[in-house]
């Protein structure tokens, strides 16, 4: 299983270089699961929609769409998806993929991350 995590610092679809990175992860590397933090208002590009499923969750308390979290996963192996809220209000996604639980969370910077992780 190939898993990748990436803080794209904004929607990859709005930047040609970031879009090339995303396409590389999904086509060349053929990652089974790609987790993106700060993905903006992400929509899965049409050329990948037949094979992949995606989930986008807004962070609670965020004042813009930049801090959204996204998981892109191969459709054939996704068993379930759960949404969690950390102690600081940040959202997390848990994906059961082929029997493995995979989590993504965009933690607060600094010491806030300890509370985010501990309270899940």
Model-derived features: where do they sit?
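Short, flexible loop segments at the rims of nucleotide/cofactor-binding pockets, characterized by
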Residues: 8-15, 81-83, 111-113
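Structured beta-strand-rich core segments of catalytic domains in phosphoester-bond hydrolases
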Residues: 33-108
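N-terminal, active-site-proximal structural segment of metallo-dependent hydrolase catalytic domains
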Residues: 1-49
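Active-site-proximal segments of metal-dependent phosphoesterases and phosphodiesterases across multiple
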Residues: 10, 103-120
């Amino acid at each position: 299983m190939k898993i990748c995590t990436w803080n794209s610092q904004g929607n990859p679809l709005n930047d040609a270089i970031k879009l090339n990175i995303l396409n590389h992860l999904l086509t060349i590397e053929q990652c089974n699961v790609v987790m993106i933090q700060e993905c903006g208002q992400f929509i899965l590009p049409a050329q990948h929609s037949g094979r992949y499923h995606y989930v986008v969750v807004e962070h609670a308390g965020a004042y813009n769409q930049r801090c959204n979290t996204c998981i892109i996963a191969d459709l054939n192996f996704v068993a379930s998806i759960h949404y969690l809220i950390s102690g600081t209000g940040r959202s997390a996604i848990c994906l059961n993929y082929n029997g493995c639980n995979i989590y993504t969370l965009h933690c607060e910077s600094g010491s806030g991350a300890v509370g985010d992780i501990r309270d899940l």
